[in-house]
Amino acid sequence: MSYIGKIPTAAALTSSDISDGIITNAKLAQDIISGDTALGAEPADTDEFLVSDAGVLKRMDYSYIKGGGITVADQWRLTANLTATNGTISSNLEQVDTNALGSLGSAMTVSSGIFTFPSTGFYLVGFHGSGANASSADNMTVIIQGTTNNSSYANIAEASESSSGAAQEQIAGLSTQCIVDVTDTSNVKVLFQTSSFGSGSYLMGSTDINYSAFHFIRLGDT
């Protein structure tokens, strides 16, 4: 460029030299994203993204958009027949570990039959089992109890089976489930109880197959 008089001193371009909105999308390199270094791991909660909020460009932490999908799916089972017991199921319990069976995410923990959740959230809690009634014992009941204070428990789901009038042992399925809002893992817990079991009644158990199993699936945040 030609000048009349003295050539001006060179100066670096600064942000104040450019009006807002003057640089269009067409002026940006096509590899402005793909040409940069890949993160290679899940972002930290404080990592930021640019989003268009009703046409206004804003930044957002990853913590607001992460998640989705099931993060906990755990199975436990009764490893031996439970005979003529009315009360909390507290023994012969194991997390499933054979063949194609498995669990997802952090595991439940159990102590004296009381199950503790690995994290807060809404959980689908269920019992699905096989029970046997002797001809002299007409009923079997399995109850899910829950607490919100790690102390007092109340019935929250129940499954019953009756073989009244049967001349011989009857095998039947028992199934019940509920959704538990785990707002505090120290206080919100569940247990499973048997009730109305006669002297010849029992829940079936095995270390190799899920005859009587307990299921915990985290559905989402509380």
Regions inferred by a protein language model and the residue ranges of each:
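Extracellular repetitive beta-rich solenoid segments
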Residues: S2-T71, V110-S111, P118-T120, S135-S136, ...
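Short, solvent-exposed aromatic-acidic interface loops
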Residues: E158-A167, T194-S196
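Short, surface-exposed tryptophan/glycine-enriched loops
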Residues: G165-N187
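Residue-level detector of short, conserved catalytic/binding motifs and their immediate flanks
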Residues: D47, Y123, S186
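Contiguous beta-strand segments of beta-sheet-rich domains
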Residues: N187-Q193
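Terminal (often C-terminal
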Residues: K66-D138, G146-N150, A159-S162, G200-T222
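Contiguous, function-dense segments enriched for cysteine-driven chemistry
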Residues: A157-A159, Q177-C178
